[in-house]
């Protein structure tokens, strides 16, 4: 009776451990590096968009035309696999815009050009809740520092060039992320913070 009970317990433990073992990634693929791109981040886009909005309002009141071009957001990231469900790493992002202001509504000549760039450097953690050799689903959080750089060329002034910069706390939450691939993979993420709210990317593991 005791022997049968011991065998039954051993069988149960083996069966229970199968999903966990199946979720563990390959032990030799601890490092991950990748790049990503998207249209803009919620907070970075808000900072730049607010500046563009008030600039556009002032230009409208002054009867001057303007045009804005957004560069998009780009990132480079590195992660180290601690165990089958947790990764730690660091993420660097950059996004920006260029606004051209004209002397009149007919765009006869350029009055000024404004450029805004936002850089962030954020330590990051990922939590993988579905881990298979070819597919990983995860969520994550980032917290670090950001830097806003503004450059204006005003052709109507004697001193046409002006610059400004500010540091600020940067953060991000990855609500949903998916990696598809083993040593080389593609990714898709939904973010809220200073990473692109929709992001696509590629990467490699070793």
Language model features with spans:
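Cleavable N-terminal export/targeting peptides
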Residues: 1-30
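Extracellular loop and loop/strand-boundary signature of outer-membrane beta-barrel proteins
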Residues: 60-64, 106-113, 157-164, 185-187
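Outer-membrane beta-barrel translocator domains and adjoining extracellular loop/strand segments
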Residues: 45-53, 100-108, 149-159, 198-203
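Transmembrane beta-strand segments that form the barrel wall of outer-membrane beta-barrel proteins
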Residues: 181-194
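Gram-negative (and chloroplast) outer-membrane scaffold detector with strong preference
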Residues: 39-41, 69-152, 178-180, 184, ...
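Short glycine/proline- and aromatic-enriched beta-strand/turn motifs that initiate or cap beta-hairpins
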Residues: 21-80, 203-205
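Glycine-rich phosphate-binding "P-loop"
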Residues: 142-172
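Residues that define the transmembrane beta-barrel architecture of outer-membrane proteins
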Residues: 29-31, 68-74, 115-121, 135, ...
